[in-house]
């Protein structure tokens, strides 16, 4: 049963989503479009993971704005982000199992991203009335 009474919690979730999105865009953009030094500092990054996360950063911001405005579609967008991130994480896991080069911090980051978006969806879907 939705609990539409918790605007504060949704605002916190929205702020987390927007901040996470802006940081993702900045970090991913610096590797994709920045200097060679930025790419070297990133180590063995995986291009499809990097591109997905960079583009998803923009979706994070849109989802955060929707959550702030208490729009039901924002909860479904959060689910889409969680599922998409999990799918890219699974493809990344296959790359690792096949012996591809990677950074351990990417495993941690993808775990965090998947968890954060699953939690945001679970929370928002219970707080925004249909």
Which residues are covered by each model-predicted region?
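Topology signature of small-to-medium multi-pass alpha-helical membrane proteins
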Residues: 1-130
